[in-house]
Amino acid sequence: MSTQLRNNPMKVALASMVGTAIEFFDYYIYAAAAVLVFNTQFFHSDDPLSNDLLSLSTLALAFFARPIGSALFGHFGDKIGRKKTLVASLVLMGGSTVVIGLLPNYAQIGIWAPILLCVCRVGQGIGLGGEWGGAALVATENAPEGKRAWYGTFPQLGAPIGLFVANGTFFLVSYLLGHNALVEWAWRIPFVSSILLVAVGLYVRLTLHESHVFVEAEQKGKKLNAPVSVVFTKHLKPMVIGTFIMVATYSLFYIMTAFAQAYSRTAPKLSEAGYALGLGIPANTFTGLLLISAIVFGIFISISGFYADKIGRRKWLIWVTIAIGVLGLAMPLFLENGTPVSVFAFLVIGMAIMGMTFGPMAALLPELFPTEVRYSGASLAYNLASIIGATIAAMISLKINASFGVMGVGIYLAINALMTFLALLASKETKNVDLTEI
């Protein structure tokens, strides 16, 4: 095999990281806009809570579209290669984000505004569905022996980078132009400016060599005509296990970002059931707190990769999942009648745990599948988990809080942690798996 097919570590890091950075940049600017802007710009109801729920429901649309993207891009990623497929997913994902920044609002085109917003959100979701699996494979299939989880943190580090850049952009726009300008028109700036990240990502990925693991499988004639169907017929068990291993991670991330922001900035009033609907913390204050916690997120992703290579993915994640459950049950201590200080403590602790659970996933999920279905299998597990862990949370977390308080949301997180814990118990350690042999 020619040595030109090997990629240097810096290129692997950038190629895998940039797409995930765009993914989470897209996710968070959309989540922030759904809370701050879309509820008034794209939806027209006399009930503010209804507008909030409709706006956050569009956030959930992408999670439903992700498995479609997983099947589509997974099929081509396992048939024609990781590189070409990653380029296509990046164009769809990034292009949809830019178009959102150009959409007219409800006052300009009426009901077509939320319809077009939903179409773009579905486009984002389909592109996102093919992004992470390919990025994880670029990292792990190019990793040296014994460092697969460490290399797997490259795409995962894109998450705090995207989170930081997205929040930083919103913070600067709001600070420099004011909140009124942000709500009226300046919210478009982060969406349109994402074209710069897409351009960087395309440049790096177009200069990348195909994974040597995929090339070896291709030379051995291991390519399949319908890899997605093979995942469901021959590799259903690892896909189900992988899906539930990822569920708690998604739930935690959604609650740490979208729910925490919506709850923190909502005026401090009571629901009909007598529970607090919010804390009344200014949006810029919360954004500043989240910026700092995003740095903590990144630090603990790197730590998790080191320990997942040292002690194993399964053992590491079992302990971290227990911590997620404990955090869920402790949520009222931080958020009920909370202050900026207690919210900050919640964000820092939660993002540290988030880094520890998210970090090893780019190594673990691909290790569950053989090369000929690895893109499809890892992508499907990752994105099916988003429906259970994030989509449902997006649709019901505010209602749970209104009916049962913060404790209800915390119990929901703990239940998701329990599902992940049981999936980990049902799994096997994959640290020493040879990706060219399975």
Curated annotation (Swiss-Prot):
GO molecular function, one term: transmembrane transporter activity
Protein name: Putative metabolite transport protein HI_0281
Cytoplasmic side: 1-17, 74-85, 137-156, 203-239, 308-314, 364-377, 427-438
GO cellular component, one term: plasma membrane
Domain of life of the organism encoding this protein: Bacteria
Keywords: Cell inner membrane, Cell membrane, Membrane, Transmembrane, Transmembrane helix, Transport
Periplasmic side: 39-52, 107-115, 178-181, 261-286, 337-342, 399-405
Compartment(s) where it occurs, according to its Swiss-Prot or TrEMBL record: Cell inner membrane
Record has Membrane as a keyword: yes
Lineage of the organism: Bacteria, Pseudomonadati, Pseudomonadota, Gammaproteobacteria, Pasteurellales
Record membrane topology: Multi-pass membrane protein
The species this protein was found in: Haemophilus influenzae (strain ATCC 51907 / DSM 11121 / KW20 / Rd)
Pfam families, per the entry: MFS_1 (PF07690)
Family: Belongs to the major facilitator superfamily. Sugar transporter (TC 2.A.1.1) family.
InterPro entries linked to this entry: MFS (IPR011701), MFS_dom (IPR020846), MFS_trans_sf (IPR036259), MHS_symport (IPR004736), Sugar_transporter_CS (IPR005829)
Membrane-crossing segments per the record: 18-38, 53-73, 86-106, 116-136, 157-177, 182-202, 240-260, 287-307, 315-336, 343-363, 378-398, 406-426
Database matches in SUPFAM superfamilies: MFS general substrate transporter
Keyword hit for Translocase: no
